[in-house]
Regions:
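C-terminal helical cap(s) of enzyme catalytic domains, especially alpha/beta-barrels
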Residues: 283-292
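Catalytic cores of alpha/beta
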Residues: 189, 263-276
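Active-site beta-loop-alpha junctions enriched in small/polar residues
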Residues: 49, 77, 90, 155-157, ...
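Hydrophobic faces of well-ordered beta-strands that scaffold small-molecule active sites
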Residues: 44-47, 72-74, 150-152, 178-181, ...
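Metal-dependent phosphodiesterase/phospholipase catalytic core, i.e.
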Residues: 5, 10-16, 20-33, 40-41, ...
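Short, acidic/polar
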Residues: 53-63, 134-138, 207-220, 262-269
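Short extracytoplasmic
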Residues: 38-71
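Catalytic domains of carbohydrate-active enzymes, especially glycoside hydrolases
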Residues: 60-78, 144, 222-226
Length: 292
């Protein structure tokens, strides 16, 4: 009798959790996603460009735009004189012929460097050296691609670039064109406070919380402050992007963008699973698979 009561209690709790999850309010729809038609899904998201072109450069973005990708992804830091520039790392060492911390350099110093210097596919030829490729400003990105959907990842943690980034987005009327992610939870919270009208992706801790609560069927208890989850397939060997994860996210009206997928068989697998976007260095392969 006791065992039966325990089982009944467990069943009722499980049912209650499931009902709470199903009844949970979805995230409000954001106008950022209105720029995509149903036929565009999954979105072809051009990862900053390291495999085919010099990363985070206007040259790379121009090549991807010519391929008619759906979204241009880029990374941003801020210079010592307050200019927001496209670059992945904290320093210029890995991608240019210079050295130094971006936040300690002026825009003039940053843009004097060759951003095509270290790009190579075979460690022998460096075809972009001396071609006039520089580190661009985000302002240049907005002026060059005013009608393109963008994902602008905040890489710099300190000093905060939330307010300057928000000001620039508003200046160019990109509030419904830009989606802002950051691995750093403090950075993304600062941006949301400064720019509540712009769509954001979940920070690292928010992703972990969503995964854990979803696994425990408590996904409906999360108060959502984000419109998208941008995640790898696994984190520390633990699967993240599963069909159940996608169901939880879509049930809350949250899109799932997976990164960084460059192999055709993996692309096909995630297309079949129903992800909303695939971030890739090989947009050419993904577009071919999608028949575009």
């Amino acid at each position: 009798m006791t065992k039966r009561i325990v089982l009944m209690i467990i069943s009722m709790l499980a049912l209650g959790i499931l009902i709470a999850h199903l009844a949970a309010s979805p995230a409000p729809h954001h106008a950022y996603f209105d720029q995509f038609s149903p036929e565009q899904y999954p979105l072809v998201i051009a990862h900053a460009g390291s495999e085919l072109y010099p990363t985070d450069t206007l040259y790379a973005l121009e090549q991807y735009a010519a391929m008619d990708v759906d979204v241009l992804e880029m990374d941003v830091h801020m210079t010592a004189d307050g200019e927001i520039v496209l670059i992945h790392d904290d320093t210029v060492d890995r991608t240019t012929d210079g050295s130094g911390d971006v936040r300690e350099m002026t825009l003039a110093e940053v843009q004097a460097l060759d951003a095509g210097w270290y790009w190579t596919q075979d460690d022998q030829d460096y075809p972009f050296r001396g071609q006039g490729i520089t580190i661009p400003t985000l302002r240049e990105g907005f002026e060059t691609f005013p009608d393109y959907a963008m994902i602008i990842e905040i890489k710099q943690e300190k000093p905060s670039m939330a307010a300057p980034l928000c000001d620039l987005i508003r200046e160019y009327g990109m509030e419904e064109k830009a989606l802002i992610p950051s691995f750093n939870d403090e950075s993304i919270q600062e941006f949301r406070a400064a720019c509540p009208e712009v769509a954001t992706a979940a920070g690292h801790d928010e992703v972990q919380d969503f995964v854990i609560r979803g696994f425990l069927l408590l996904g409906g208890t999360i108060s959502l402050e984000f419109e998208a989850l941008q995640v790898p397939e696994k984190d520390n060997g633990i699967p993240i992007v599963t069909r159940l994860f996608l169901w939880f996210a879509h049930n809350r009206n949250v899109q799932v963008h997976i990164w960084t997928i460059n192999e055709p068989d993996e692309m096909e697998r995630f297309i079949d699973m129903g992800v909303d976007g695939i971030m890739t260095d090989r947009t050419d392969l993904l577009r071919e698979i999608l028949g575009r």
